[in-house]
């Protein structure tokens, strides 16, 4: 683990981190702020008390880096696009309330009987329309490829290269890539290679070690090399800590600091 890791802005994903911070989800926000984090993120807002979230965020003065636009569905299927776009409208309103910078967009699962290129093109159409909505709200959209080998069997968008091709077709500067280093490595990608032509296209980043999806330092990722590749892509935003801690949150963070030092 390079000392460089701790020079990045870090954004804990509160679905897994600070789960030991209190009985209610807003307590996780307070615990993260107490630990010195100025940015946090989570998966979805629809299963949470938004008023309580908003109060905790305002109280702690934190920024939400990202949460998932709902409903998720299958944007590989054009028949779902109206529902998806209505969800983006609602999610943008929530994002403004919660001081969120980005909405995460997922492709949904593959349609087995439909040509792959047609599904990829359908994502581009949906993102172009969603991007227009998000731009009016001042919110970014980030498209996330996921691994299909371990965690998300059947998911359509498993390749960083394909995600970048879709984003180039969309051509909106506020519709960018959510690069998840863990998912990328699990899919056998070389981060330096897939990020080589991604300058200006990475809107957010998630990290966890692989194998295992635990805190950095517990797996086999060459962190110095991969963080250098990320810097070379022009990305200088937050690293979302989306890992399953092998110990309590504070202990896992202390472990990262210890091996980074």
Task: Report each predicted region and the residues it spans.
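Histidine-acidic metal/acid-base catalytic patches
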Residues: 1-36, 99-101, 157-179, 183-261
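Active-site-proximal loop/turn and secondary-structure-junction residues that shape catalytic pockets
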Residues: 16-18, 44-46, 70-73, 109-111, ...
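N-terminal substrate-binding region of glycoside hydrolase catalytic domains
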Residues: 29-46, 68-73
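Conserved beta-strand positions in the central sheet of alpha/beta enzyme cores
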Residues: 41, 66-68, 104, 142, ...
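Active-site-adjacent beta->alpha loops and helix N-cap segments on the catalytic face
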Residues: 46-56, 113
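Short hydrophobic interaction/assembly module
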Residues: 54-81
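Active-site acidic/histidine proton-transfer and metal-coordination neighborhood
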Residues: 59, 78-176, 186
């Amino acid at each position: 683990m390079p000392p460089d890791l701790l020079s990045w802005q870090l954004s804990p994903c509160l679905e897994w981190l600070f789960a030991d911070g209190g009985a209610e989800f807003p307590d996780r926000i307070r615990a993260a702020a107490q630990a010195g984090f100025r940015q946090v993120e989570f998966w979805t807002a629809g299963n949470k008390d938004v008023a309580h979230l908003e109060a905790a965020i305002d109280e702690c003065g934190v920024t939400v880096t990202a949460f998932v636009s709902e409903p998720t569905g299958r944007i590989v299927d054009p028949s779902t696009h109206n529902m998806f776009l209505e969800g983006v409208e609602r999610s943008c309103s929530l994002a403004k309330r919660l001081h969120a910078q980005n909405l995460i967009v997922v492709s949904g699962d593959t349609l087995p009987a439909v040509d792959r290129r047609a599904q990829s093109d359908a994502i581009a159409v949906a993102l172009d329309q969603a991007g227009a909505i998000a731009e009016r709200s001042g919110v970014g959209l980030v498209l996330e490829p996921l691994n299909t080998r371990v965690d998300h069997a059947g998911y359509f968008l498993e390749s960083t290269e394909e995600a970048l091709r879709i984003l180039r077709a969309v051509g909106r500067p506020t519709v960018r890539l959510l690069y998840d280093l863990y998912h990328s490595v699990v899919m056998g990608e070389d981060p330096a290679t897939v990020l080589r032509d991604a300058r200006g296209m990475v809107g957010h980043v998630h990290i966890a070690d692989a194998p295992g999806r635990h805190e950095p330092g517990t797996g086999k990722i060459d962190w110095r090399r991969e963080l250098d590749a990320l810097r070379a892509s022009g990305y200088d935003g937050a690293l979302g800590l989306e890992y399953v801690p092998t110990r309590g949150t504070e202990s896992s963070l202390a472990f990262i600091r210890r091996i980074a030092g």
